[in-house]
């Protein structure tokens, strides 16, 4: 492509971003929020894990998969802290290898401590054995729509993911997918994604920029550029004005945040919470969001809110009546002391990090 045509393409993307930003304001108002996936563990039981994934590099190092699971009090403590600082749970994830009952119990308890329904991203799940009263939606890990998808994600057949999402829709749940940019996708793949969104009637989509992991084939590969990322986000917004768009970037890509919001993103995700909260990077992230003219719900910098010394004034959380089994209520209450200890441990970790920085 000539320099002139490249310039025309960039100008087109920037113009589309401008239109997408206006559409986002029209349908979602002037706010941006933080979200974060709640991971249950570090082991993936897929026989053929994804080529890009950190868990794939750890699989052979983990002799006992159950020891790679997080303790329940740790999961619930993080859920409580996320509500405290106004970060919605993007979804409960990392559940490959869990039984439907285990997923159900965890979802019930997380919903109970947060007083709101949850999204699941735990692979193809048997929804008939899940308490749907605590589930807002189901997310499918599509990851990429490129021609190499079956090779990149051999353990995640697209047809099964689609069937699971369509069943969730029939049951009255919201649905979404995850897409990772930087896996070799082409611009023409955007049309494939738009067709998939329409086919599945999705309520939301999460984009991530590839964070190349050591030990994977992508270790030395470049990730997606800001302009490319903007093109994907604005294309989805212009074609689906009411879809929720979540965009994830790593700490080394903070300058991407403003352009992504200006391209139609509602939500920023992916940042490591406890190692970054209150640091200069966290202040920079908030500044990037506010620079777009958007209002930020939630905080990445207020230590007093994290520590529970004051209450967040503006939160994206809307409390709901949550009904779970008496058995799981009992489990939560029996763990209260341990949960509170984990909360204090997380807060102390943040304070030490800030003091050392």
From Swiss-Prot:
Keyword Iron-sulfur assigned: yes
Keyword Iron-sulfur annotated: yes
Biological processes annotated in GO: biotin biosynthetic process
Domain of life: Archaea
Cofactor requirements of the protein: [4Fe-4S] cluster
InterPro entries associated with the record: Aldolase_TIM, Biotin_synth/BioAB, Elp3/MiaA/NifB-like_rSAM, rSAM
Binding-site positions, [4Fe-4S] cluster: 44, 50, 53
Record key words, sorted: 4Fe-4S, Iron, Iron-sulfur, Metal-binding, S-adenosyl-L-methionine
Stretches assigned to the Radical SAM core domain: 27-242
Record-annotated membrane-spanning stretches: none
A Gene Ontology molecular function term of the record: 2 iron, 2 sulfur cluster binding
Name of protein: Uncharacterized protein MJ0597
Source organism: Methanocaldococcus jannaschii (strain ATCC 43067 / DSM 2661 / JAL-1 / JCM 10045 / NBRC 100440)
